[in-house]
């Protein structure tokens, strides 16, 4: 009722709702609920001006802190054409992310609905199907667009993570949520697959051949320099006789 006290703690926002409408929004502080504090509610419902006036409504408190260490992982393998060698490949991925409520009103209307509580686990469950669909699409897209070699993916995880985060950011924003961090920590490769192992051997054999060629070249240079030094020494020895 009017005249009640509303306390909103730091890192919180409070939203007044009535009949399914998200109306007035309160930041951190202590409030006495009077008509001047509820402009949208008063405008919509023509509230009574006496402080004893009562009305039915709900207040939702939104935690604005960053929710960290939320684990994610693909529920099935992502199939795509490996960009370097052009063979079909299926991989999985997993990692962690952190989310933060950015637009409390949008979050409330799109996700909370009539629920009385929405914690980190519930939030993760809400986004599970949405996240799996987007992430699998973006994994294949980023691998192809950036021509990331599957055999060199581990050294490119930071770039890979940032690229997927940038693509996912707008999707989460549609729900009033900011994707603060997104990390790909593990890539599940098809180890043991005959075709994968064949190209893996080819890839690393190329590096081994290059390394051996460089080693032979360096050895030849050293041998040539050594022979040149021997020639100089022999010449000096002959000159002193």
Put a short name on every predicted segment.
Residues 1-107, 116:
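Hydrophobic membrane-anchoring helix/hairpin
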């Amino acid at each position: 009722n009017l005249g009640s006290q509303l306390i909103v703690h730091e890192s919180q926002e409070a939203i007044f709702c009535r009949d399914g409408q998200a109306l007035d929004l309160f930041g951190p502080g202590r409030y006495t609920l009077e008509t001047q504090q509820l402009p949208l509610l008063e405008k919509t419902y023509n509230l009574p001006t006496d402080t004893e006036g009562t009305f039915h409504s709900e207040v939702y408190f939104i935690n604005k802190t960053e929710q960290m260490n939320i684990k994610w992982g693909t529920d099935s393998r992502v199939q795509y054409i490996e960009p370097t060698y052009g063979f079909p490949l299926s991989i999985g991925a997993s990692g962690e992310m952190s989310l933060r409520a950015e637009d409390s009103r949008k979050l409330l209307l799109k996700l909370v609905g009539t629920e009385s509580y929405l914690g980190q686990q519930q939030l993760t469950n809400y986004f599970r199907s949405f996240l799996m669909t987007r992430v699998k699409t973006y994994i294949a897209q980023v691998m192809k667009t950036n021509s990331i070699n599957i055999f060199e993916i581990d050294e490119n995880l930071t770039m890979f993570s940032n690229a997927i985060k940038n693509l996912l950011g707008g999707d989460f924003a549609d729900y009033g949520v900011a994707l603060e961090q997104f990390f790909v920590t593990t890539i599940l490769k098809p180890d043991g697959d005959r075709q994968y192992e064949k190209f893996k051997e080819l890839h690393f054999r190329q590096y081994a051949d290059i390394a051996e060629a460089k080693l032979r070249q360096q050895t030849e240079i050293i041998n040539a320099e050594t022979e040149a030094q021997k020639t100089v020494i022999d010449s000096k020895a002959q000159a002193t006789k």
